[in-house]
Design a protein with these regions (language model features):
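Hydrophobic alpha-helical transmembrane segments
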Residues: 39-43, 87, 91, 127-131, ...
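Membrane-embedded alpha-helical segments that form the functional core of polytopic membrane enzymes
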Residues: 121-142, 146, 205
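Hydrophobic alpha-helical segments of membrane proteins, primarily the transmembrane helices
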Residues: 40-47, 128, 132, 136-139, ...
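Transmembrane alpha-helix/helix-exit interface in multi-pass inner-membrane proteins
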Residues: 98, 102-110, 134-155
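Hydrophobic alpha-helical transmembrane segments of multi-pass integral membrane proteins
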Residues: 43-54, 91-106, 132-134, 182-189
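Long, highly hydrophobic alpha-helical transmembrane signal-anchor segments
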Residues: 2, 6-42, 90-126
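N-terminal helical submodule of small eukaryotic multi-pass membrane proteins
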Residues: 60-111
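Cytosolic/stromal cytosol-facing helical appendages immediately following the last transmembrane segment
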Residues: 1-39, 58-67, 71-80, 151-280
Length: 280
């Protein structure tokens, strides 16, 4: 909650003119409780989850032949009913699991120092912080995901996510409620170690969500912007993990592939790629 009642008051305290973004933020957030600002995160996740996978899903339903050559597993269709069931279950999980978690974790958010006031962070500051969050989340998520593929972790929790042997964007957050809670820890770990402004926190969560949807889209498009990010896994890389399914001990990477390479959990994938290359 901002304690300034007007732009002139804020400028007097900060001893400078507010930027356009800061003035807009003041008008929006002044008098708004920090809990409600933090709760925006679940709203953003629902909007992104609904809209981000939609164009590709519509294209796959209306013009499948136009993009079939880019589909990683072209012979295994995903029905509309399965996608709708997935969407319904994920929305329920967001509202019944992630939503309450947002409220319960609010004291922790305040304790670690995620702020809502002025000044707003610079673009360089926001970029550096998100960069740290990516690295921290990627490493921590690798081990959580790998633990989910132990016999107990898979049987009790992770098998739900692997119901989709052919990934689709809408299935990115499709998982057991306990897995949603566990995977929230790596995502929050970066902001806990390097506290940020709430707007950067929103940005990080949205980017992470979009990345997960892209990774699960099931299509390997040649000119996707993420193709130019070094060590980025992407859809084709993660698709192999779902293709193998229950027995998969490969490609646990969340975003980048370096952990799989360092710890030797990409050997099956590399063998699979080499075999496909020889067949072609």
């Amino acid at each position: 909650m901002l304690h300034y009642r007007s732009v002139p008051e804020a400028e007097a305290v900060l001893q400078r003119n507010l930027t356009t973004a800061e003035a807009a933020w003041l008008r929006y957030s002044a008098g708004t409780h920090d809990l409600w600002l933090y709760f925006h995160n679940i709203i953003f996740l629902l909007v992104v989850y609904t809209l981000a996978p939609l164009p590709l899903a519509v294209l796959e339903l209306t013009r499948p032949d136009a993009i079939r050559r880019y589909k990683v597993q072209p012979k295994v269709p995903v029905s509309l009913s399965a996608v709708l069931r997935c969407y319904r279950n994920v929305v329920c999980s967001f509202l019944l699991t992630v939503g309450p978690l947002q409220i319960l974790s609010y004291p922790t958010v305040k304790w670690v120092g995620i702020r809502t006031g002025l000044p707003l962070p610079t673009w360089w500051e926001a970029t550096a912080q998100v960069g740290v969050y990516v690295v921290v989340e990627d490493y921590a998520n690798y081990w959580v995901h790998r633990a989910m593929h132990t016999p107990w972790g898979y049987e009790k929790i992770h098998h739900v996510h692997h119901e989709f042997t052919v990934p689709v964007g809408f299935a990115a957050p499709y998982a057991h409620w306990a897995e949603l809670l566990l995977l929230g820890v790596p995502s929050f770990l970066g902001p806990a170690l390097v506290p940020c402004h709430i707007t950067v926190f929103w940005l990080w969560m949205v980017l992470r969500h979009v990345e997960a949807i892209e990774t699960h889209c099931g299509y390997d498009f040649p000119h996707t912007p993420t193709k130019y990010i070094p060590f980025y896994g992407g859809a084709e890389y993660h698709d192999y993990h779902h293709f193998v399914g229950r027995q998969s001990q490969s490609n646990f990477a969340s975003i980048f592939t370096y952990c799989d390479y360092i710890y030797g959990t990409d050997k099956g994938y590399r063998y699979h790629k080499d075999l496909r290359a020889k067949i072609r």
